[in-house]
Design a protein with these regions (language model features):
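ATP-dependent carboxylate/acyl-activation modules
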Residues: 1-275
Length: 275
């Protein structure tokens, strides 16, 4: 920590989530905004100012009072933009001298240099009345080799890139999780709902609320769709490609629906389920 007041328990929890997500994004391009350990905006852009603005556009309301983590060095132009929003913590791979001067104008804003942060192998510990459970964190970075195209329609190279991006982000969203994305930027995130259909509707409504509809929309789900209704809702909202884990007794129905609607569908053998 190089500036700001003392970190709280919740700050540390959010910082870990933000650092972990930003480190999973393409190096030198990634920005993530986290609120209550959930990402509310994620983007990967070569232009750092655009990366932040794109992440913020996903849900600027939820971003208020959140944490921003960038896997690149913050310079003065971005610092000026960051100071326009109330934030608890900003994490980056360093800050140039002008950026520090600008950001220090807010005396309580916590600035963290995460340059030397390495995740390594991490474990999650959960205590309960009669004991403790330990499991390794879900940190694998997914690539093209981890997915199988099961629809007749094949993804374009752009769709595949966005699908991989969305699925990698999806693992950090509390289940049931749905991530809508375009151009390596989230445009709608539905999280923490007992019903996967409800998470679909939340993601869609967020996208519409902030006018982020696009012709190049893809969606990722952290687990399989138990019924057709979820993917149907996504396709009706403009989604043209979907990635989801397989394993449902209705997988064939999902594939048939994708083919009937000319939708790209990819299956993964791995579920996320963040709790």
């Amino acid at each position: 920590q190089i500036h700001g007041k003392q970190l709280s328990y919740n700050n540390y929890n959010d910082i870990f989530s933000a650092l972990t997500i930003s480190r999973s994004l393409p190096k030198g391009k990634g920005t993530v905004i986290v609120k209550h350990a959930n990402p509310c905006g994620v983007s990967a852009k070569n232009d750092h100012l655009e990366s932040y603005k794109s992440a913020l556009s996903c849900d600027p309301v939820s971003a208020f009072g959140g944490i921003v983590s960038c896997n690149f060095k913050i310079k003065s132009d971005l610092a000026v933009e960051l100071n326009k929003l109330f934030l608890e913590v900003i994490i980056a791979n360093g800050f140039d001298s002008n950026a520090i001067k600008i950001l220090k104008a807010k005396k309580n804003l916590r600035l963290i240099d995460g340059t030397n942060y390495t995740s390594g192998e991490l474990f999650k510990f959960v205590s309960f009345n009669q004991g403790i459970m330990i499991q390794s964190e879900d940190l694998n970075i997914f690539s093209k080799k981890n997915f199988k195209v099961v629809s007749k329609r094949k993804p374009t190279s752009k769709q595949l890139k966005d699908l991989i991006f969305a699925f990698n982000v999806c693992r950090y969203v509390k289940s049931n999780a749905i991530v809508l994305a375009s151009n390596e930027t989230t445009v709608g995130i539905g999280s923490g709902q007992p019903s996967r259909l409800d998470s679909c509707e939340i993601a869609i409504n967020k996208m519409k609320k902030f006018n982020l509809q696009t012709d190049n929309l893809v969606a990722a789900s952290d687990a399989f769709f138990p019924f057709v209704d979820g993917i149907e809702k996504l396709v009706q909202s403009g989604v043209r490609a979907v990635v989801q884990p397989s394993g449902s007794i209705r997988d064939k129905e999902i594939i048939n629906f994708a083919n009937e609607t000319n939708t790209v569908l990819l299956f993964s053998k791995t579920r996320h389920f963040r709790h």
